[in-house]
């Protein structure tokens, strides 16, 4: 599959099968984000639920939210994903950080639910070289405090790259967490391509085997969204360094094959690549032009 730049267009034609979007800031509001992403050719987006390097939560204006909800219908935007801040760690051996993390997750779920956001994605946690089983236990306890039977939003556990003491780089770890959640019908998985490749799942040469394993261990019905990115580092590197699509070790062809995989093609795809708006516009169009229609 070769990238053909002759067909690159701007804007959103609105008639493409795949639901592709980007990670985008809401610093200027949801309305601005929706308009900009749609103008880039996207049909969904991901945003941080609060300051990704801190704890401050943005106050949303009612007028902005109302306009955003109208635009969602007008643009026919797919599921919107909120990403938890990097400062939380539900698996931390530090009780203070763990308590802070639980409060943030609980508050975020309530806030995102009130906005009609479909998915709340988080990194499961890092046991910081202590006891992995205790770390998994703490993640389960934290999520059980936050997830309710009545909520509509789905909490997603992100697949991780396996660097350091991260939890979530193996399907079995994610399954263990899910099994411990009381209301686990409210829990799913977000697959990050760079993380998957870096953690040792060969999505380039053995995609079908990887997806079969995912289905057997977790269940394909749990997979709700995909972070699109390439990897600056090689296979099984245990490193988390994103690259633009086609400029890393995963490559464009493998990315397209994954997006066309029968059990994945209807999922929302969120670009998490180190590019600005124009780069993302070109990336979205590159993917659309090369995908089967």
For each of these PLM feature ranges, what is it?
Residues 96-109, 132-144, 170-180, 207-215, ...:
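Short, electropositive alpha-helical surface patch
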Residues 74, 90-188:
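Active-site acidic/histidine proton-transfer and metal-coordination neighborhood
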Residues 23-27, 50-52, 84-87, 125-127, ...:
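Active-site beta-loop-alpha junctions enriched in small/polar residues
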Residues 1-84, 88, 92-110, 293:
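N-terminal pre-domain/capping segments
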Residues 45, 140, 144-243:
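Acidic/histidine-rich catalytic cores of soluble enzymes
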